[in-house]
Amino acid sequence: MTTMNFYDDLVMQTQMNYSRHYPIYASGGTPYQLTDKKPLPYSEQIDRLVQEIKEADCVVVGGASGLSAAGGGDFYYEDNDSYRKYFRPFAEKYHFKGDFAGMGHPWKTREEYWGYLATFLHTTQTAPVRHPYLNLDALLKGKDFFILTTNQDTQFVKLYPEAKVAEIQGDHRFFQCAACCTDDTWDAVKPVADMVAAMGDGTKIPTDLIPRCPHCGGEAFPWVRGYGNFLQGKKYEEQYEKISRYVLEHKDSKILFLELGVGRMTPMFIQEPFWNLTLSFPHARYIAINNKYDFLPKQLEDKGMTIVADIAQVLRDARDTMENGDNNQ
């Protein structure tokens, strides 16, 4: 097995498991036997989280959608204040129940389709770093760490060099050819800003601003999985190479796998590989923070912990605990 495909192979293995047990996952469950140990009181969980971070030689953070949602990036699945703030013209015209509802809408024109898509991309490209990310950053201060994320919203790369972040589901800052005629990706930030500026308070962009592939002339598309023909070329392989190299270089260290906000749609990218690695590596530890799911495999009950609470609150409390402890030393 090469370094490049080590983590990719883990993902493929868990994808096969996901397919075999899809009804269980679709109902919000997991096919794995879970621990029946009673969880620690919340305050003790926070203390343990802080202690595990301090004692770890290195930390691998797995950041998923729940992390961004906890910081206000919660406009994907419901018509809430956040959605109205960014998508008001579309919300009032079409009454979508969140961003993803609009993504699946049968748009009558490409100009309006791109008006909606550009609005979405602009919200993430220009968003400030959200508080949960800042509190996580404070917890990682002075640590050797690496970030693995399925989020495409650019939050992590606003904080850290790209060498420390693996974006295995893509990145809203880049376009690709929708037909994958080329392995190239290119800047999406300026074209998106131009589309949003030209649209004003409307819902359509000018035809000549529809982004196109510089090679074949066909339409471009955001370099992200989930909305189209995701390009799994050189840039994609580089993401898996980064996480694979880091994990293999630290497999004998006291490594903490810290999972944040993984749901039931994509447990195969972060959660289950983290479980496998924690079980396999002799000094590995695992902590998951989730506002809904309490999934700790029985095989990991002595090497891990789940904290079922609001992610933003947990990271804020952990930061306060760590900083207060440091001040009292």
Predicted regions, residues:
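Conserved catalytic alpha/beta core of Sir2/sirtuin-type deacylases, generalized to analogous enzyme cores
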Residues: T2-Q329
